[in-house]
Design a protein with these regions (language model features):
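Extended, well-ordered protein cores
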Residues: 3-75, 80-316
């Protein structure tokens, strides 16, 4: 006998997924003013007809590798909607592990989830992190109705642990800027990605689109170069420096303190046509004909969009 899961219409999962993605993007755009500015510039230049016409290559989340959380927990949400996991990436210096997830249909974005390998940090950093994450006593996805898109959206934006203190945030920042970002932002969407290769020429390459961004006053992340190219040359990426956002921390004495920290950012991706399909007419090219997946070298630099040595450039 088939399970209720197997009998559930596929469309219901996809509708729920769309609700979740819409919720993520709505809150992300409200917190990242650069999104509206970029989309307005693209619309004014005729690159897209309207803001909703932009093609989202992928979205990304950051997680802590601790019991009940991390990739093993968060991925369950998207696997439920038909995403499939691919390719493990290791970032030795940053102490990160990541996977990417292929969507159930090509109009949905890919997903990239990274996880901090907490046991590799110093005892002090581990102690700070677990003092918060130990408040999570079981996998929170266990109690989540994955068929309720609004509930999933709310979960992805709710606190998983108490508000961190400013002192703890600063201590983590000195050792792992990734850790500091996650201890405050939790599952908040880290970035979304504009698909560049389907834009009108000449703006359909990262090189030309970066020039467009700079001309409109945006600050590019130059960690690893402003243009990041995969080892095979077929995935070209860039990103903006994360904007600084207001954040409320605990002051350690029962009150709160307001600070400005790195928020989320925007990425841009150009996926070149694979050699076997380069004779296809442009109007016949689909996602399946282009370079898929990710590149560890590119991603290593893009992570630093939220790092202090990048964000301080906006203050100059």
């Amino acid at each position: 006998m088939q399970s209720m899961e197997a009998l559930m219409p596929r469309d219901s999962h996809l509708e729920t997924l769309q609700t979740v993605l819409d919720g993520l993007m709505r809150r992300y755009q409200a917190r990242v003013p650069d999104v509206a500015r970029v989309l307005q510039a693209m619309t004014a230049a005729g690159l897209i007809g309207h803001a909703g016409a932009v093609e989202n290559d992928h979205i990304a989340f950051r997680t802590m590798g601790v019991p009940h959380l991390g990739i093993a927990s968060l991925e369950r949400i998207f696997l439920h909607y038909g995403y499939t996991r691919h390719d493990r990436y290791n970032f030795a210096t940053k102490k990160l592990t990541a996977y990417w997830y292929r969507p159930p249909q090509v109009h949905f974005p890919r997903i990239f989830i990274s996880e901090l390998r907490v046991p590799e940090l110093s005892p002090q950093a581990q102690s700070i992190i677990t003092s918060y994450t130990d408040e999570v006593q079981q996998d929170p996805v266990d109690d989540l109705d994955l068929d309720d898109g609004h509930a999933v959206d709310a979960f992805l934006h709710q606190p998983l642990w108490r508000t961190p203190t400013w002192d703890d945030y600063q201590t983590l920042l000195r050792e792992s800027e990734f850790a500091a970002w996650v201890i405050y932002n939790r599952y908040y969407l880290n970035h979304f990605t504009v698909t560049v290769h389907n834009l009108p020429a000449p703006y359909n390459t990262i090189a030309s689109f970066n020039e467009f961004l700079v001309a409109h006053g945006f600050t590019l992340n130059d960690a690893g170069g402003t243009i990041k190219v995969s080892a095979d040359g077929n995935l070209i990426q860039s990103s903006l420096v994360a904007q600084m956002v207001p954040a409320t921390f605990a002051d350690g004495h029962g009150g709160t303190i307001e600070q400005r920290i790195a928020g989320s950012y925007i990425e841009f991706a150009e996926r070149r046509v694979l050699p076997d399909f380069r004779d296809l007419p442009p109007d016949q090219l689909g996602r399946e004909h282009r370079r898929d997946g990710f590149d560890a070298g590119n991603a290593d630099g893009i992570f630093e969009s939220t790092y202090t040595h990048q964000t301080r450039k906006q203050e100059v």
